[in-house]
């Protein structure tokens, strides 16, 4: 009988939960700001964990500066993880900025702009959307 999830998937889910709690409650660094863990990818041998993060930056903060500050905490977070999760080897954490949210919003704005431009051009030419379908 096969398992519903592989061990790496279960470990990555657990790491995501634990890291989210630790970043929210235990890491006190104003340079990081609000951070969200969007995904965790664990290597097959469970030695490395690639943690994808997004930031809500305020004021002078940039995703790059927040990521640099977060990377300074990698060793201490790994040590805390080792105490919380029972694994033979605690994965080495590598934080990576996840720009999919920003890119998704950019793409959505582009589509909205194109739709609005099409509507404006149709209105200027005196045609309606129902006329477009009859051709």
From Swiss-Prot:
GO terms for cellular component: cytosol. Monomer. Binds 30S ribosomal subunits, but not 50S ribosomal subunits or 70S ribosomes. It comes from Aliivibrio fischeri (strain ATCC 700601 / ES114) (Vibrio fischeri). The lineage of its organism: Bacteria, Pseudomonadati, Pseudomonadota, Gammaproteobacteria, Vibrionales. The gene is rbfA. Pfam families: RBFA. Belongs to the RbfA family. The keyword Secreted does not apply. InterPro entries: KH_dom-like_a/b, RbfA, RbfA_dom_sf, Ribosome-bd_factorA_CS. It comes from the Bacteria. One of its GO terms (biological process) is maturation of SSU-rRNA. Coiled coil: none annotated. Keywords: Cytoplasm, Ribosome biogenesis. NCBIfam families: rbfA. One of several proteins that assist in the late maturation steps of the functional core of the 30S ribosomal subunit. Associates with free 30S ribosomal subunits (but not with 30S subunits that are part of 70S ribosomes or polysomes). Required for efficient processing of 16S rRNA. May interact with the 5'-terminal helix region of 16S rRNA. It is found in: Cytoplasm. This is Ribosome-binding factor A. GO terms for molecular function: ribosomal small subunit binding.
